[in-house]
């Protein structure tokens, strides 16, 4: 059945206010009858026994003749009316749609009148036996019927569904009613979260919950949201990352932990950024960043196979292969590979990169920017969007990796990776810094950057440093953006398409 047919109705083309008034009048009639009979106009006693998709699956191999020649199979279904042609209706439940056949000869006149007066969007209960039409559609031959919920507003646009993007985001419930693709997107999201949870649990990780409000924002370089605790009369910050709490748990002996939860960053909104977003963050003791790259490859490949049935994932006209192993290249080499005008000496020259950032990238170079910071800017501006197929970028500068362990052979870089696909960062992981003295010094450097005007630099967290002083075993940690991963699997162009209720500007009036 097409979207157009599903939205058809016999209602005349009149204003929405008039349609609403008509529905209120119908509700008044229902209430009057309910009062006379002692029944509720909003009944709540019907118990559904069958779902549309289950019935479609159960009878998919049975022809019209086979169904008619067998003993009747009686069912009880419920759902929202999406089509009402008098002789048959279509209802929609959480699994899909099924037709209801209205036998004009077998139903009382008052029941037929009630069915005729149903509006699209009304929620009904139906009982009857299974049949199949000459066109091959499965239906329920209606023998019993009850209006459960009267819809007082008409569904959006009768023939074209809900196409206004802003309305889709503001009124997601309507989007879910009329757009099957939207429902599929959020079913994929649920499978992604469940799949990650199952994978990590199977690897002996323990799921935990850590605070959402922090005394000191930390765990990432980002601008936080600030709030105030009235009873304690103190400022608090919505968390930008759970990292510092999760590592405390590893200190405490929980050697494999993960958390799936929200982070909040008071930054810009775009097709890939929302101020409130979902992350999976996990930590594994006695592992390094290379172990987590391997784990990530295995987990993403399994998710793609389990959810989509393939490792070749189509996204916005491209096809990304989730079949591991993925490409691995250092940030230094990635800059060279994507900027053929550079020599290795150029990429290692602070003054050369500072001039390039100022003159070619048209970005400010602050006095405190070191070589690592400038390399990171050049990478972000000239390389990131070119990383189409799954790629691990490794060996990030220590200057821009305040929580990562320094590389044993080169202290100016860290044992860190970021994972990119489709030109977007999807994950960030590293061997954790477990030297409390080095960590304290890096926090102090971050404070200096904050004092110099960098709003995203980290605060000094003395309590975390104290926890490290008790001893953090060799550990690796990683965070993966759930929303961006769902975008890939659902072929969604914007992060707002995969968040049920994305943040919007306040609607005037």
From Swiss-Prot:
This is Lysine--tRNA ligase. Homodimer. Mg(2+) 1 binds at residues 418, 425. Pfam families: tRNA-synt_2, tRNA_anti-codon. Binds 3 Mg(2+) ions per subunit. NCBIfam families: lysS_bact, PRK00484.1. InterPro entries: Aa-tRNA-synt_II, aa-tRNA-synth_II, aa-tRNA-synth_II/BPL/LPL, Lys-tRNA-ligase_II, Lys-tRNA-ligase_II_N, Lys-tRNA-synth_II_C, NA-bd_OB-fold, NA-bd_OB_tRNA. Keywords: Aminoacyl-tRNA synthetase, ATP-binding, Cytoplasm, Ligase, Magnesium, Metal-binding, Nucleotide-binding, Protein biosynthesis. It comes from the Bacteria.
């Amino acid at each position: 059945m097409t979207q157009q047919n599903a939205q058809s109705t016999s209602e005349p083309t009149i204003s929405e206010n008039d349609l609403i008034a008509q529905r209120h009048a119908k509700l008044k009639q229902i209430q009057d009858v309910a009062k006379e009979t002692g029944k509720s106009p909003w009944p709540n006693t019907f118990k559904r026994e069958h779902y549309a998709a289950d019935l479609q699956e159960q009878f998919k191999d049975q022809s019209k003749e086979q169904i008619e020649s067998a003993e009747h199979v009686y069912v009880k279904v419920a759902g929202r009316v999406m089509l009402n042609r008098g002789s048959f209706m279509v209802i929609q439940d959480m699994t899909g749609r099924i037709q209801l056949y209205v036998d004009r000869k077998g139903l009382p006149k008052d029941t037929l009148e009630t069915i005729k007066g149903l509006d699209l969007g009304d929620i009904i209960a139906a009982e009857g036996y299974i049949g199949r039409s000459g066109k091959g559609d499965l239906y329920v031959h209606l023998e019993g019927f009850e209006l459960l919920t009267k819809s007082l507003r008409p569904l959006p646009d009768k023939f074209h569904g809900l196409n206004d993007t802003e309305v889709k985001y503001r009124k997601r419930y309507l989007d879910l009613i009329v757009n099957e693709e939207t429902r599929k997107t959020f079913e994929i999201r649920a499978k992604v979260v469940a799949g990650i949870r199952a994978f990590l649990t199977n690897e002996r990780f323990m799921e935990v919950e850590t605070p959402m409000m922090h005394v000191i924002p930390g765990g990432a370089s980002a601008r936080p949201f600030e709030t105030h605790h009235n009873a304690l009369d103190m400022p608090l910050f919505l968390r930008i990352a759970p990292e510092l709490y999760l590592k405390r748990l590893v200190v405490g002996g929980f050697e494999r932990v993960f958390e799936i939860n929200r982070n909040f960053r008071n930054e810009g909104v775009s097709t890939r950024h929302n101020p409130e977003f979902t992350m999976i963050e996990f930590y594994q003791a006695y592992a390094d960043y290379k172990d987590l790259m391997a784990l990530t490859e295995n987990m993403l490949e399994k998710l793609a196979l389990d959810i989509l049935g393939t490792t070749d994932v189509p996204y916005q006209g491209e096809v990304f292969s989730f079949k591991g192993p993925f490409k691995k290249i250092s940030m230094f080499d990635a800059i060279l590979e994507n900027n053929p005008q550079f020599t290795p000496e150029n990429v290692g020259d602070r003054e050369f990169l500072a001039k390039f950032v100022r003159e070619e990238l048209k970005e400010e170079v602050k006095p405190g920017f070191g070589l690592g910071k400038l390399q990171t800017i050049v990478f972000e501006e000239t390389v990131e969007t070119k990383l189409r197929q799954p790629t691990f970028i490794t060996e990030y500068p220590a200057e821009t990796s305040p929580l990562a362990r320094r590389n044993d052979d080169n202290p100016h870089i860290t044992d860190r990776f970021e994972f990119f696909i489709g030109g977007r960062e999807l994950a960030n992981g590293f061997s954790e810094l477990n030297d409390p003295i080095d960590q304290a010094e890096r926090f102090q450097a971050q404070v200096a950057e904050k004092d110099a005007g960098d709003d995203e630099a980290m605060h000094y967290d003395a309590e975390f440093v104290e926890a490290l002083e008790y001893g953090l075993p060799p550990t690796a940690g990683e965070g993966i953006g759930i929303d961006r991963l769902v975008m890939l699997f659902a072929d969604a162009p914007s992060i707002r398409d995969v968040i049920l209720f994305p943040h919007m500007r306040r609607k005037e009036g």
